[in-house]
């Protein structure tokens, strides 16, 4: 059996779908469906069971899985809202919960692959290499992720099974509808074009011209590919960047969406006051450690990925069961 926490979420549901494509349906989905929307991500997936995240936590604390053959745990479940400022809540959900799942996997020698975040690099002024010298946190979400990364580094020497943390950069692609304002810029711009025939980007700030802030945007299929590559190849434990290593400006993103949809123009809006001092104007993964681990499967070209994503959205926007 394979366990995917956050399996009804964006990246988790994509991992499940790819596992299905590879013939695996013996999957336990762990999530919380209370928002009434993310259940839609499950309709096109094949899995043997579902468990609420609180019940799953109780199960691992009670050792209810003793004797169950678990091949891997993909821990994608988290609160990823960068505008959530309840630090106690963030630490409970993203740090304490993750520690419980980690120690369960260590105890039973189950590969543990988890979602970290490029937000742990703060402003990025020290670079984007995995390690304390580059890391910082601009918001509670980033702090909760950074705290867990640091905890993992402490326990790695005593681990007898694989532990892999992947610092996701800006992920985009199918099955992110439910994320609302936290969905990728690609999804936001797709909807803007549908409604107004325009895409609205931030004006310049901190020395950047209008729309010229740059991020490392990574297609969700590539994120899934990196996860499964580490697991299937029993690659070395550690914390790795999961980004393309090449940044693109928001102007490039806006134009890619316009080109994919065949219509539209770009306009600029004032940079929000609430984000000043808390916003990453530039991100770009340093891929050295990922490549050193042996990963050689590459990443999608952004324009091609955007066209594929737009076509997916135009054709219903959710995975189909059995396809």
For the regions a protein language model found, what residue spans apply to each?
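N-terminal Rossmann NAD(P)H-binding glycine-rich loop of SDR-like oxidoreductase domains
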Residues: 2-22
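Catalytic helix-loop patch of NAD(P)-dependent Rossmann-fold dehydrogenases
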Residues: 92, 96-100, 107, 120-165, ...
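NAD(P)H-binding glycine-rich loop region in Rossmannoid oxidoreductase-like domains
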Residues: 44, 53-54, 58-93
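A short helix->loop->beta-strand "cap" motif at the edges of active sites that frequently abuts
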Residues: 24, 108-110
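Glycine-rich phosphate-binding loop and adjoining beta1-alpha1-beta2 segment
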Residues: 29-57
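NAD(P)-dependent short-chain dehydrogenase/reductase
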Residues: 126, 150-229, 256-258
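SDR active-site strand-loop-helix element
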Residues: 5, 30, 73-77, 112-118, ...
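C-terminal substrate-binding subdomain of Rossmann-fold SDR/epimerase-dehydratase oxidoreductases
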Residues: 194-323
């Amino acid at each position: 059996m394979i366990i995917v926490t956050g399996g009804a979420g964006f990246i988790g549901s994509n991992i499940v779908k790819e596992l299905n494509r590879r013939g695996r349906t013996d999957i336990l989905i762990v999530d919380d469906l209370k928002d009434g929307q993310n259940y839609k991500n499950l309709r096109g997936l094949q899995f043997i069971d579902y468990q609420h995240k609180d019940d799953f936590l109780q199960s691992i604390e009670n050792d209810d899985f003793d004797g169950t053959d678990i091949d891997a745990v993909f821990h994608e479940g988290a609160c990823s809202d960068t505008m959530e400022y309840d630090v106690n809540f963030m630490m409970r959900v993203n740090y304490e919960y993750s520690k419980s799942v980690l120690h369960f996997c260590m105890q039973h020698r189950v590969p543990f692959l988890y979602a970290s975040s490029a937000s742990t690099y703060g402003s990025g002024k020290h670079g984007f290499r995995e390690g304390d010298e580059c890391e910082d946190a601009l918001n509670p979400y980033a702090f909760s992720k950074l705290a867990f990364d640091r905890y993992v580094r402490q326990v790695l020497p005593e681990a007898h099974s694989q532990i892999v943390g992947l610092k996701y950069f800006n992920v985009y692609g199918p099955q992110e509808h439910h994320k609302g304002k936290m969905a990728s810029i690609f999804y936001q711009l797709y909807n803007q074009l549908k409604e107004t025939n325009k895409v609205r980007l931030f004006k310049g700030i901190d020395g950047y011209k209008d729309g010229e802030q740059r991020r490392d945007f990574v297609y969700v299929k590539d994120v899934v590919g990196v996860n499964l590559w580490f697991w299937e190849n029993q690659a070395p434990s550690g914390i790795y960047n999961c980004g393309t290593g090449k940044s693109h400006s928001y102007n490039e993103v806006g134009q890619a969406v316009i080109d994919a949809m065949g219509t539209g123009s770009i306009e600029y809006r004032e940079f929000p006051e609430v984000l000043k001092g808390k916003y990453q104007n530039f991100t770009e993964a340093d891929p050295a450690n990922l490549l050193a681990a042996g990963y050689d499967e590459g990443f999608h070209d952004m324009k091609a990925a955007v066209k594929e994503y737009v076509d997916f959205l135009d054709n219903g926007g959710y995975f189909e069961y059995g396809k």
